[in-house]
């Protein structure tokens, strides 16, 4: 089975009466010439790393090697525990986890690139928060990761998941789309609703540039992970409510590629424009590198 079209994956799943995750697990086992149990176990290890990366990123005092970032997940969690959040506990918890994982990455900890290190907090925060709120068993989260991976493969095949190729829309956009589709399946949505969630998430972030201060995956990347999980939640909520994307997911992916191709190289991970070249951005760069 090819992974070059979200619509084809959805059609195949519907034809066979399977969830996207079930279809992908069977397909990947066949491609890898391994059993489904072996593929499941491998994905389960990724889930464990995701959980560990959340805990590691909650450290109040741990700072990145550059000294630019650290402690924000702790601050956000304190606000959440104190009932000071605006958007409610679910989104608050998701933000905490997204920032925590991204901080773990900035501190050279172990994360799951999902699909990249720069966007590593979005998928885990979405799924682990949903698990916490709805008491979902690990096995269901592992299966949802197969759904997410399929969306990621299609995006990587037809566009890119790299900031250097397509800007942050490719990194945080892909992660948001993956998370949105996975959440929809976990909440009982259909494969078609997963497709709509993917499309909506990508549309919401189309055109976002990659402009890391000092060329490091910290500013604004860590906070963009919090924004990315928010985007995924919006897309999943809309899709589960029956809201459909007028533009199919596959066409949105192609549009994202075209937008990325039109972006100046200065806006694609080179730290030569955007926030990286603001007066404060330059000062922070000098602080790190002298």
Regions found by a protein language model. Name each.
Residues 185-290:
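Functionally critical mobile loop/hinge segments
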Residues 88-105, 140-159, 204-212, 247, ...:
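Acidic-glycine-rich active-site phosphate/pyrophosphate-binding loop
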Residues 37-49, 89-96, 106, 121, ...:
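Conserved active-site and cofactor/substrate-binding residues in soluble primary-metabolism enzymes
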Residues 1-109, 133, 242, 249-290:
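Generic N-terminal targeting/processing segments that precede catalytic cores or assembly contacts
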Residues 103-128, 169-174:
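Glycine/serine-rich anion-binding loops at beta->alpha junctions
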Residues 124-135, 180-188:
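Alpha-helical support elements that line or immediately flank enzyme active sites
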Residues 86, 113-120, 132, 136-137, ...:
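Glycine- and small hydrophobic-enriched segments that form the cores of compact globular domains
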Residues 146-178, 182, 204-231:
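A structural-propensity feature for long, helix-poor, extended segments
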